Structure formats: C-alpha cells, structure tokens
Amino acid sequence: MKNVGMKPESYRVAEAQAILYAPPHCIELLRQGNTEKGDALKTARVAGILAAKRTDELIPLCHPLPIYRADVEYELEHDFVKIIAVVETIGPTGVEMEALTAASLAGLTIYDMLKPHCEPEELWMDQCKLLKKKGGKSHFKRVLRQPVAAAVIVLSDTVAAGRKPDTAGKSVVETLTEAGFDPIHYQILPDEADTLKNLVLELSKSYACIMTVGGTGIGKRDITVDTLEPLLERKLDGLMEAARSFGQKRTPYAAMSRGVAGFIDRSLVVTLPGSRGGASESMAAILPALVHIFDVCRDLPHPGGYE
C-alpha cells in the first residue's frame, strides 16, 4: 500500500454513479417497491452504504478510512435507474473508491432483485464512473502558480563547525524546490542571536519566504524563537499550530517545539525544528497553506520583481 502517513488530513468528498438498464415494467417495480425479494431501492441503499464502509476489505490496496457520510440516491427513468453515491471523510486520502464501490454494489443489488422479473439479456450495468471529488492535492494545491523566492537558514553549532552534516535543512530545500519556490538561498549559521537577526532582516528585503531550521527547542542554545519572535509584525500562529498538531500524532516530542511564524514587512518567516523528521513533518503539514499564501499575496518581494 502507498504510504500516506506524511499527508495531512483534510475534508474529502466523492460522488460516483452507476446506471442499471432494465425493462420499463421492472422500473415500475422499483417505483412501487414490489419485487419478489422486497423493496429493491431500500435494500440497495443499505448495500451501498455498507460497501462504502468496507471498501478497504474488498479492494486490496485501498486504505481504511473513517466514513463520516455515505448516501445512495436514485433517478428513475423509462428504462434505466441512475444510482448516485456520495461519500465524505476527513482523512489523508480520498474516498473515490468508496463512492464507486457504493454505486456499483447498489447497482448489483438492484440487478439481483430484478432478475426474477425479466430475461438476463434485459439487465445490464453501464457508466460506473466518478462524477466529482473534492479535497486533497486536487483541491489544496502543493505547487505554486509562479516562482517565489525563499531562503533556508540552518541554525546549528555542530553543523556550522562541520562536525555533523545537515539533513533537515536540505530536506526543506528539496520540499520548497518541488513546490516551485525559486531562487532558494541556503545558509548555515551557528546558534548566534545577533548573526541570525541581522541576516533575517537583510534577507527579508529580497525573499518572500524565510525558513529557519533549528533552535526551536528548550535548550540553552536554542535561540531562534527568542531572536525572531520580537521581529514579527504580524504573527501567523495557525501555521505552527498545524505543524505541532501534525507532529504530535507522530511523536510526543512535537509538543516541545516553540516554533513561531509571521511577517516581517512582507516577508513570511517560519521557524522549523532542527531534526530531519521534525522539519519534514512540519513542511508536510503547512505546505498547502504556504502555497495558498503566496498564490494570493502576489505583491510579496522577489529578486527582480514580478512581471
């Protein structure tokens, strides 16, 4: 199965249909709820709902998801019934397969209950397809429409001294690159408050996004938050709340992060944890919001300006 552990949860909905063709007298039986086996539409609705809830047991590589809503509705025509299934969840992946499975099994249930009333060649299913979906990467974009200049500053005495390689900062650079940020300034600093303050103020004149990596913990040398928080003119607390909530589901140590985010003039500053896992998890949680911020606020600074 595909690993969806690093995908943030979001509201998702999918709508699917299936069409069952049948002789007109069978469609009338559906309207009356009067087949040999009982009310076919009511029975099929229950079957479709159960199918949505158990899709992961039927389709081998489909992820189990909490189903918050599963509905099956019908449109009865002269010689066919259109089955429409709607499924909703809040999760890391979509419910397209759940909606398709619900529509399919509802159709098969109706087929089973109508077959005593007609010849086999008079019943067939068609046009089982997804009608629409909402949520996830198709709705919450993770790639910029236009490039945005970003800077990544790694704060670590040991990395700056060459005693340990940087992995967290490079993972942030990689994520930003994949999201369309360009150019990206990358720099390593020791945990020195004045050096960090001066660099961030200078970079804020040319870079719309400044990401610091490291110095958000509770150690004596963790000076990033104490240095940058007083500089923030407009705080954006929701970014780090999202990052901590996402991280807390993966490690209890996420609660120790003091990270902050906000604007210095028109430059967004975000302080990330210094561990590879903490930085990666934080980026996974906040990237859709980052992309939205910079797609909306097109007057943010960029070297050379925007055309």
Where on the chain are the PLM-derived regions?
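Glycine-rich phosphate/diphosphate-binding loop of Rossmann-like nucleotide-binding domains
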Residues: 112-116, 140-191
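A glycine- and small-aliphatic-rich helix-loop capping segment at beta-alpha/alpha-beta transitions
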Residues: 171, 226-234, 286-292
